[in-house]
Amino acid sequence: MANIKSAIKRVEITERNRLHNKSYKSAVKTLTKKYFDAVAAYSASPSNDALQAAQTSLSAAFSKIDKAVKRGVIHRNNGARKKARLARALNRHLANAAS
């Protein structure tokens, strides 16, 4: 354990930031799972309601990822990769539906 006052404070700040970052990462994962569930529902039975639900979930996930990047919780390349994977999932099903 740290003995110096500034080192003790840094340990406390690091722990606080770790918990804050953990909540952001958890929220990103939760919204991502909800989005993939919405895409699966749209794939199972394509309808305008299912598509609208998937697009709403996509918007929420994009927003949370962008906020996590802005706050430095995840790297911008990591955020871009996550967003690309999300967009690709829906676009793949939309292309299959159009064919």
UniProtKB/Swiss-Prot annotation:
SUPFAM superfamilies: Ribosomal protein S20
TM region(s), chain numbering: none
Keywords from the named record: Ribonucleoprotein, Ribosomal protein, RNA-binding, rRNA-binding
Any one of the GO CC terms: small ribosomal subunit
Xref: Pfam families: Ribosomal_S20p
GO MF annotation, one: small ribosomal subunit rRNA binding
One of the protein's GO biological processes: translation
Cited function: Binds directly to 16S ribosomal RNA.
Homology family: Belongs to the bacterial ribosomal protein bS20 family.
Protein name (database record): Small ribosomal subunit protein bS20
